[in-house]
Amino acid sequence: MAKKQFTLVVVRHGQATHNLDTFQRKDMVLTENEEMPFMNSPLTELGQKQAAMVANRLSKTKFHLGVASDLCRAWDTAQAIVKANPSLEKVEECRLVRERNGGLFDGEHTLCYAQHTVEEAIEDRELLTWRIPNGESVVDLRVRVRAFLNDIQAKAAAIEVENPTILVATHYVWMHELYHVLAEMSLALRGEKRGKKPRTPNTGVDQYTLTTRCGEDGQHVLEQVVFDIISCGSHLDSVSTY
């Protein structure tokens, strides 16, 4: 069946209020009218400047599609990129790329770091089924990441360009898990084991070149994953990052 190669340019949001060392849970902003609310922190002034910097970095990239988390820190970062890029008129809302819901740990930097440290020690991430109270497990997040990959392969295949480029504006932990999932696929496909993902700064960029094939059942299957750029914040050289 027909193959399609496409590029994902994945961008973390600019600095948000919950990234500040002074942030407290009492300052938290949540999404409304949801059974499981998500933290919905706005960009700081620095975060807005960072968004403008990554927008300038990507201003000459020809995008054929853009998707973004609806959480305002990622959505507003995406809007800055749209404003600076003549090839991209808008981005589509995609809740699959929302940040992992940290539940009671959201805004608690020490607890989040401890949780991350424990989870990184487990090689088989499908074992990480424990949910943070009022939040998501790693496995819950991986379900969303895989659903996104299925969806974006279908969308890429439908774009009438040979090698389309797609913008994804999202979040730190989501990007971390996407890397894990793609690294596992790359290992299964080609026996190539990837190292640990470096820390991604605010507005840091990952770029992947993916090759997909549509099977006889109509389902898309990844055949190759190329890790082009990982955790790059070169556009932030003169700006403090979190």
Where are the model-predicted features located?
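An N-terminal RHG(E/S)-centered segment typical of histidine phosphatases
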Residues: 1-64, 79, 83, 87, ...
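Acidic, low-complexity terminal tails and accessory targeting/binding regions
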Residues: 1-7, 100-112, 158-162, 179-242
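Beta-strand elements within well-structured catalytic alpha/beta cores of enzymes
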Residues: 7-11, 161-173
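Short glycine/proline- and acidic residue-enriched helix-loop micro-motifs
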Residues: 36-39, 120-140
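Phosphate-coordination/substrate-recognition cap region in phosphate-metabolizing enzymes
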Residues: 49-122, 195-206
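Glycine-rich phosphate-binding loop signature in dinucleotide/nucleotide-binding domains
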Residues: 60-62, 152-164
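Short beta-strand scaffold positions
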Residues: 68-69, 143, 169-170
